[in-house]
Structures are given as structure tokens and as C-alpha cells.
Curated annotation (Swiss-Prot):
Produces ATP from ADP in the presence of a proton gradient across the membrane. The alpha chain is a regulatory subunit. It is an enzyme of class 7 (translocase). SUPFAM superfamilies: C-terminal domain of alpha and beta subunits of F1 ATP synthase, N-terminal domain of alpha and beta subunits of F1 ATP synthase, P-loop containing nucleoside triphosphate hydrolases. ATP binds at residues 169-176. This is ATP synthase subunit alpha. F-type ATPases have 2 components, CF(1) - the catalytic core - and CF(0) - the membrane proton channel. CF(1) has five subunits: alpha(3), beta(3), gamma(1), delta(1), epsilon(1). CF(0) has three main subunits: a(1), b(2) and c(9-12). The alpha and beta chains form an alternating ring which encloses part of the gamma chain. CF(1) is attached to CF(0) by a central stalk formed by the gamma and epsilon chains, while a peripheral stalk is formed by the delta and b chains. It comes from Halalkalibacterium halodurans (strain ATCC BAA-125 / DSM 18197 / FERM 7344 / JCM 9153 / C-125) (Bacillus halodurans). Belongs to the ATPase alpha/beta chains family.
Length: 502
């Protein structure tokens, strides 16, 4: 059998044409140092900043320091199995988290993986955790109220949708309680809530989840938890993961509330990572870009223009102070980024004024334009009255013979403080807040003993609910006060039947 040369050449041509290469080219590096949640790798010449990298045991990392001879990687998971000399390869992707309505009612870690034992989350949508904030022309000024259900906040330090309002105070002053009450109060308000727990005890997070479940608030809430036992990289990423989940809803025209509890622990985790990556330390050993750490996060909260769908993200970041020192580095940074702050004072908390809001140091820079007219009308002088009372209270301790005007101011002040007290997880609808503050400023409480004020309040609400529901409905639907004489007549009618304790 003779083999013809032209047949051989055509066979070879055919083989070459049909040849399929299964070789995949991958950029691979080698781990040269690992420890404390940080790895240093050689190679990876063309890696991107923030790119996801995969170690040989399947654990993911994120490229942070891009240096001439090596790459600093933060490890997003357990690092005890990673050894010097291990391979680390590029994925070509940047850090993303799953997003969508499937996450509602779930507890996830900062990578979007469920940690509540209720099975996988069926969503195919993802968003990068770092994304640019909406530009100037994409925004609209804050004009819709976000009712927290807390009298002292909704009356004196109002929050609007799209605002960033800092909640600042020492540990154990009721910061988390304010956030939980605000989330509970969003029921039936078409609002999606995201609670980001950073460096909290797992028992605390479990308690928060259970409280939300009991009040039916978990159905519209996503809990993102990076507990104290997690590595620093996850604590650093948790807030960005939370806001990315919120952006998916915002850009679809929905309203979102994101609570960051708390950013002090995120800053500490970022300081830890930066020092391990050998970045130069600055004031209080924080790296030079710690301001940018928080500003790029909080700038993503916005009220979008109508052309962009009119959605919003409202941010409630928490900062924990040491002995009430608001002039430390991180507190001053975040105060300068946000649109106001609610300052909680431990002295007030321990003296039984809860929520322990210090009205003098608290401010809302843009919330006033979002307040309903009825609340604006009744609460106009509340802050000044309270400040005057605090001043007189200190003065009155030194002398007993006070003139009638001073005594009247002290009496009104005591009742104001009493009215602004509120039980835990008892948020009030805005129409009831308006009713009790209206009664207060019009002198209906001046002759009620201080000890009876809380009872007067609850019985007034019951009376209005059963006998004068149209007054409350009018405030809720129109945002305006009802007819003055009608409102006063209703409160007078109730007061005549109110029995004070002897």
C-alpha cells in the first residue's frame, strides 16, 4: 500500500484546522508570607486593585497593596491552611455580593453567604461592593420624612429620606435601640431596612434578629453580620456589602434605610489591616485614608432625582465615643461627613431619660425640610424650651426662692422631659407624637403631676383612638394640624375625665 504525500499533507492540514487547545492561561503567584489575615504574594504582575484572588485551598483574598515585587492580599476567610509557597491565582473579578429581594428576612455575612441556617439564597444578581456615589445632577434635595417613631428625634432632630444622620454616644447609651425602633417603625411604610452589625457579639446580633422577628420587621430587613470573631477583612468590608445590597433597591425606585452598627469598629479593623500591610500610620495610628474609608461609604446614601427613579438610601451610622469625647479623630471625621448627629449622653441615660438624646448637642442639618407641617408647627420652640430648662435647672439648685415665671419654666421643662421619654421598642406614629406635643405646648400638662404625665399620654392616645379618630387621621393624611378649637376641645374633654394620683 503506497502512501501519497498529498494525502498526508491534507490529513495534517485537517488535523491542524480541527485542533482545539484546552490550555487556559492563568496569572499565578506564590505566597511568600502569611499571617494575621494578610498574605504577601510574588508574581501576579497584572493584578487589579481590589481584584479577587483564589488560594490553592479555595479561600478567597482581595488585592490591596500593589507593589513593585509583591502584592499585599487581605484574606476573606480562615487563613490557617494557607502556607508559604502556596499558589494564588487571579480570578479577573472584583469583589461582588448577591443582591435582590431574596435576601429579605435573611442573616448573611459580608460575602452575602447565609449564616442563619435556612438554606441557600436563590439569587443570580450581584453588585460590586465598591461603586461610585450618585453625582450632583442625579440627586434631589431631601424632602420626604423618615419617621423614626421616637418623639425626641422626630420633633427636634428630624431625619429625611436620603439623609445621613450620625448616632453618636458612649457604649451602653441606647444607640442600637434607636436603630431597632426606627426599623420597627418602618412597617407598612414601603421601606427596606438593612442592619449591618460590625464587630458585635454574636449573641447581640441574635438578640436583634429575634426582636425584629417578634415585631414582624424581619420580613423587610436584611441583617449583614461580621461578628467580633471574624477576621478584620470581613469587618472592613461589611458596610460596603450592606450599602451595595441597598443600592439594588434604590436604583429600582425603592426607599432603603441602612444602619451601620458601628463604624468605630470598622475603622479599627481597617487600621489593623493597614498596619499589617505596612502602610504608614497617622493620627491615633489610623492610616492617612481613614477619612476616605467613611466618606466613600456614606456618600452612597442619597435621594435620587425623579429621572433616576426617585429612590433613596438613608444612612444611620453609629460611632462609639470614649467618655463622651466627640473631638477624637473618628468622631470628628464622621460628624463632618454626615448631615447631622444625634448625641446620646450617658448621664441622661443613667438618670432615667431614655432615649438619652442631648438636644443641645444634636442637630439635623437637612431634616427640617422633610418634617410634616403639623410637627414643624408644634415642635418649633421645643428645643429652645428644653435648653432653657437645662440651664435653669442647674441654676435652681442653688436657690429656693424663684419667681413665678422661672418656676413656670421649670415646671414646663420637667413635663417636656417626661413627655420625651419613651419605652423600649414602642415607636409612636407621627400623628400621636403631634397630639401629645400639642397638649404639652398649649399648657394642658402644666397642672398634671410629673409622675402622671406618662399615664396621661397613654390614656389620651386611647381616648383619641376611640372617640376622635378623625383628628389623628387628618394629621396622618394631610400632614397639617386639625382645626385649633376642635383639637383643644378634644384634649379638654379628655382632661376633664382624667384622674390624677394623689
Amino acid at each position: 500500500m503506497s502512501i501519497k504525500p498529498e494525502e498526508i499533507s491534507s490529513l495534517i492540514k485537517q488535523q491542524i484546522e480541527n485542533f482545539q487547545s484546552d490550555v487556559q492561561v492563568q496569572d499565578v503567584g506564590t505566597v511568600i508570607r502569611v499571617g494575621d489575615g494578610i498574605a504577601l504574594a510574588h508574581g501576579l504582575e497584572s493584578v487589579m486593585a481590589g481584584e479577587l484572588l483564589e488560594f490553592s485551598n479555595g479561600v478567597m483574598g482581595m488585592a490591596q497593596n500593589l507593589e513593585e515585587n509583591n502584592v499585599g492580599i487581605i484574606i476573606l476567610g480562615p487563613y490557617s491552611e494557607i502556607r508559604e509557597g502556596d499558589e494564588v491565582k487571579r480570578t479577573g473579578r472584583i469583589m461582588e455580593v448577591p443582591v435582590g429581594e431574596e435576601l429579605l428576612g435573611r442573616v448573611v455575612n459580608p460575602l452575602g453567604q447565609p449564616i442563619d441556617g435556612r438554606g441557600p439564597i436563590e439569587t443570580s444578581k450581584t453588585r460590586p461592593i465598591e461603586s461610585p456615589a450618585p453625582g450632583v445632577m442625579d440627586r434631589k434635595s431631601v424632602h420626604e420624612p423618615l419617621q423614626t417613631g421616637i418623639k425626641s428625634i422626630d420633633s427636634m432632630i428630624p431625619v429625611g429620606r436620603g439623609q445621613r444622620e450620625l448616632i453618636i454616644g458612649d457604649r451602653q447609651t441606647g444607640k442600637t435601640s434607636i436603630a431597632i425602633d426606627t426599623i420597627i417603625n418602618q412597617k407598612d411604610q414601603d421601606m427596606i431596612c438593612i442592619y449591618v452589625a460590625i464587630g458585635q457579639k454574636e449573641s447581640t446580633v441574635a438578640g436583634v434578629v429575634e426582636t425584629l422577628r417578634q415585631h414582624g420587621a424581619l420580613d423587610y430587613t436584611i441583617v449583614v453580620s461580621a461578628s467580633a470573631s471574624e477576621p478584620a477583612p470581613l469587618l472592613f468590608l461589611a458596610p460596603y456589602a450592606g450599602v451595595s445590597m441597598g443600592e439594588e433597591f434604590m436604583y429600582n425606585g425603592k426607599h432603603v434605610l441602612v444602619v451601620y452598627d458601628d463604624l468605630t469598629k470598622q475603622a479599627a479593623a481597617y487600621r489593623e489591616l493597614s498596619l499589617l500591610l505596612r502602610r504608614p500610620p497617622g493620627r491615633e495610628a489610623y492610616p492617612g485614608d481613614v477619612f476616605y474609608l467613611h466618606s466613600r461609604l456614606l456618600e452612597r446614601a442619597a435621594k435620587l432625582s425623579d429621572a433616576k427613579g426617585g429612590g433613596s438610601i438613608t444612612a444611620l451610622p453609629f460611632i462609639e465615643t470614649q467618655a463622651g469625647d466627640v473631638s477624637a479623630y473618628i468622631p470628628t471625621n464622621v460628624i463632618s461627613i454626615t448631615d447631622g448627629q444625634i448625641f446620646l449622653q450617658s448621664d441622661l441615660f443613667y438618670s432615667g431619660v431614655r432615649p438619652a438624646v442631648n438636644a443641645g448637642l444634636s442637630v439635623s442639618r437637612v431634616g427640617g425640610s422633610a418634617q410634616i407641617k403639623a410637627m414643624k408647627k408644634v415642635s418649633g420652640t421645643l428645643r429652645l424650651d428644653l435648653a432653657a430648662y437645662r440651664e435653669l435647672e442647674a441654676f435652681a439648685q442653688f436657690g429656693s426662692d424663684l419667681d413665678k415665671a422661672t418656676q413656670a419654666k421649670l415646671n414646663r421643662g420637667q413635663r417636656t422631659v417626661e413627655v420625651l421619654k419613651q419605652g423600649l421598642h414602642e415607636p409612636l406614629p407621627v400623628e400621636k407624637q403631634v397630639a401629645i406635643i400639642y397638649a404639652l405646648i398649649n399648657g394642658f400638662l402644666d397642672d398634671i403631676p410629673v409622675g402622671d404625665v406618662r399615664r396621661f399620654e397613654s390614656e389620651l392616645f386611647t381616648f383619641l383612638d376611640h372617640n376622635k379618630k378623625e383628628l389623628l387621621d387628618h394629621i396622618r393624611t394631610t400632614g397639617n394640624l386639625p382645626d385649633d378649637s376642635e383639637f383643644k376641645a378634644a384634649i379638654t374633654e379628655f382632661k376633664q375625665g382624667f384622674v390624677t394620683t394623689k
